[in-house]
Amino acid sequence: MARNDGIDRTVARNQDLETPDDVTKVQEHNEREKDSYSNQDIVPERTSLNVHFKAPMDDYVKMFEQMEQDGVISTRGLKPDAVKYGELIFDVNSAYFYNHGGYEFAKQFYADAYKAAAEIVGGEQYILSAVMHADE
């Protein structure tokens, strides 16, 4: 969202993830597990500023499978083409945060977004990870 045109933008989207491999790719990006990224907006020197509102306890696919085993969720009866995985993304251009209080304002914004996401999905138990990327 780094357009640098002076217009504040906020995007909230629910991204379907079709396969466990897609989930793994999202995890590698979200948790900064890769050695390099095609996204040129990522500044590796700032990764330590990223904030987890909920840190994953394992890899995303294993956590999902554990939720199934524990009865937290059920995929029984889903159609074969049903989408089992999703990613809820809140994206705001950096200029908005710079103009409204900087890093601390961004942390509070995303803390509030996390609370909203938990309500949207029916509770924190359905969220595998929630992270603010301050390095983008």
State each model region's role.
Residues 1-136:
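N-terminal nicking endonuclease/strand-transfer module with a His-rich metal-binding environment
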